[in-house]
């Protein structure tokens, strides 16, 4: 664990988010050039997305020189690449740290303009399996659409409550309270969020290490203090609907923050490409995101 923690804390590179779940899979496949008439049920759909993820992970461009970690969906964790479970393949063949998406999706938007995470009664069992599958860390997402101090406080409190369970299971949690980039009051949301996160970080015991995954902030370096916080392993950014070019541009202006992009990583990849075209496109995408992460 120490070698892995050291890599995550100080390594150069970014985190590839490959954790599209049931809701976002059809969209991800469509962007990849696989239409909905090409599969007739969930199993076929997940087989196709696993093929896409396998193609990305096995690509020569996908390696530890630029990529520190990869976030997986539960079904991907239980699937294999060349006879090895995905997490083992990532670490043993690529020296890339495997993370697992552990949330069960979002509750509906509430009166405070936030979406907390759905209840997760089987979390303890999932964390046990994650350990058996050699997962390094976890990720869970909530969404903030309004500058409501009460709503944002609840989002952050829930995130840190679940993070404590993850830490107790011996894993590193990525706390992801996403601020919707279309918020009219995005700046206020982000300031309230920063203050809430600071409060919770300062209350963590010394044995707790967490990561933060945050929307690229409107105010440059808003989260810089967290990159130096003793309880924070790394601060990563989500692309949140910005184009890759725009996301990379904003990211490069935020010191100490690295990318954890999903859609921005796979932009331009297609099932119809030859391996040579696919690898070339992926390499260019990885290079751009890497440069913005290490700036």
UniProtKB/Swiss-Prot annotation:
Pathway connected to this protein: Carbohydrate degradation; glycolysis; D-glyceraldehyde 3-phosphate and glycerone phosphate from D-glucose: step 4/4
Q: Which domain of life is it from?
A: Bacteria
* GO function term, MF aspect, one: fructose-bisphosphate aldolase activity
The protein's annotated catalytic reaction(s) are:
beta-D-fructose 1,6-bisphosphate = D-glyceraldehyde 3-phosphate + dihydroxyacetone phosphate
Q: What class of enzyme is it?
A: lyase
Q: Where is the active site?
A: 176, 213
What InterPro entries does the record tag this protein with? Aldolase_TIM, FBA_I, FBA_I_Gram+-type
Return one Gene Ontology term, BP aspect.
Answer: glycolytic process
Tell me which UniProt keywords the record has, alphabetically: Glycolysis, Lyase, Schiff base
Q: Which Pfam families match?
A: Glycolytic (PF00274)
Known EC number: 4.1.2.13
HAMAP family reported for this sequence: FBP_aldolase_1
Classification via NCBIfam families: PRK05377.1
Q: Which protein family is named in the record?
A: Belongs to the class I fructose-bisphosphate aldolase family.
User: Can you say what this protein is called?
Assistant: Fructose-bisphosphate aldolase class 1
What species is this protein from? Fusobacterium nucleatum subsp. nucleatum (strain ATCC 25586 / DSM 15643 / BCRC 10681 / CIP 101130 / JCM 8532 / KCTC 2640 / LMG 13131 / VPI 4355)
